Each structure stands twice: as C-alpha cells, then as structure tokens.
Amino acid sequence: LVNNPDKYDFSEIKTFVQNIGGVQKEYESKMDRVDLDPLQLIEDEEKFGNVKFNIKRLQDATHGVGGGNFVVIFARPEAGKSAFWISLVANKNGFAEQGKKCHAFINEEPAKKTYVRLISCWTGIVRDLIKERIDEVRKEWNLIKNNVFVYDSVDISMDDLNNYCEENEVDIIIIDQLDKINIRGSYNAQHEKLKEIYKQARELAKRNNVLVIGISQASAEAHNQQRVDFNWLDNSKTGKAGEADLIIGIGKPRDSDKDYDRWLYLSKNKLTGEHIDIECSLNHTLSRIE
C-alpha cells in the first residue's frame, strides 16, 4: 500500500467519510441552539403573545398567543364551535382588527355561509338585513376584509397547508374541522391517525411560525356538560391533547334555561398554566361569543 498506493481504489472509503460529514450537517440543521442574554429572552417572551383574545378573562388567563402555538377548540354539535372562532377573528378587537392575516379552511359547512357569518359578526348586522343595508355593510366590511381569507377545502391535506403558508402571508390558520384533514400514510386505528394529524398541525405552526387553531368535536360524554375537558375530545383520550398548547372546551349546561349560556374551560394551558372556567353568552344571529 505504501509503495504502490495507485493500485488501490479508495473511492468507497472517501464516499463513506463524505456521507458521515453530510449526516452531521443534516443533524445540525435540525437544531437551533438557544443562547441569549436573560433580558433578551424575557423581552422575546413578552413579544410572543402578540395575538390577543377579545374576551378579557381568556386574554388574562393566557396572556395571548402567537406564531408557533397550536390551539384546539372543541365542543358538542350545535354548541358554538364555529361561532367562537368567528367571534375571535371578526368581533370587535378580534384578530382581524389587530391586523393579523387570518386564513380559514372550511371542510364542514359551506364556506360561503361562514363568510356571511364573519360579515355579520363584524358589522353587527344580521344576515336577513344585509341586502337592505348593503352600502353600510360594504363600508364596514372593507375595514377588515383584507385580513380575512376563507376557503372551501373539503379534500385539503396537511402538505397543502404547509405549501400555502410558504407562498402566502399568514399569521393565523383556522381549520374547521381539523380531524378531516388528509395526511399521508396508513394507520391501524382511528386514534393513531388523529394523533398524527394533531402532531402535524403542531409542526405546521412551528415550521411556519403561524398560530394554528384546530376545531374538533367533543364525545357524547360532554353532552349538556358545563365543564368540557380534553378527556372528551372525540376518538382520542391522549393523542390529540398531547400536541396542543391550549385547549378550550365549550360547555352548554343541561340545567340552563337559556339557550345562549356557554362556558369556556381551559383544560390545558401551557401558556400560563392557568385552568379556569369562563362564563359567556352566544349570540346565534351574529356568531358572537362574549
């Protein structure tokens, strides 16, 4: 070997060594070291909750949310899931008025119906009066409409959403309903697939530095209950809940004689650790929760 090195072919060894270097580089590219001055860390955390909730007690309990967060809102059918996120987006002091680009992907009710509900929520004008007050509606809606994007998206996948974020200006993504989003792969059980959907929703938030809000159903145990916690997420005892930063259950109490009584319960709150019940009311005609 020493006397006649040209006789030997070291190409495979060279390739092996180069590949080791490539693996190390790929490994490092997946990590982002945190090494900042303590003051800088605190100031960055204070900036983090730059998306404010327009329900005071909810804002106080969370200090707001921001890019990289994954929030789950869930309830029984007809309890006000869509009305809640519509109110967070389009009610006064909501996400849209704060200047956040809100993109809603609808795979349950027709998206045109959702859009009308957003308009009513913002303007305070019920659907049946929109035509006769159209000039007023247009003037008011123009104030926030460039921050509200609504899509009919029955067959959309998580890959589609990642691509969408890369190509558009996005602050907030709302997925109504998250459980119906398509993902790659085959799964032995429904709960395994749902866990992966929620895992990918969290990754969608972190990878694109956006706030992701997923809307989901509550299981039958939550029917007529005031306090709805994450143990009642439909078809998942742990997998869904494990991925979220904040989980808000909407309760509709059995003993209430008022159809508009609602309770919000923060059964998971990694933002501040505060778990509270919030009494509120649902305005069906304006899709507002206040």
Segments (PLM) and residue ranges:
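Short, small/acidic-rich helices and loops at N termini and domain boundaries
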Residues: 1-36
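Hydrophobic/aromatic beta-strand patches that form the interior of the parallel beta-sheet core
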Residues: 71, 103-105, 151, 213, ...
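Generic hydrophobic alpha-helical scaffold/packing signal
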Residues: 59, 74, 89-90, 103, ...
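Conserved P-loop NTPase motor cores
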Residues: 180, 189-224, 242-243
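C-terminal regions of RecA-like/P-loop NTPase motor modules
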Residues: 158-173, 203-208, 220-290
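A short beta-strand-to-loop transition that corresponds to the Sensor-1 phosphate-sensing loop
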Residues: 106-109, 177, 210, 214-219, ...
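The Walker A/P-loop phosphate-binding site
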Residues: 25-124
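Conserved inter-motif catalytic segment of the P-loop NTP-binding fold
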Residues: 1, 96-188, 196
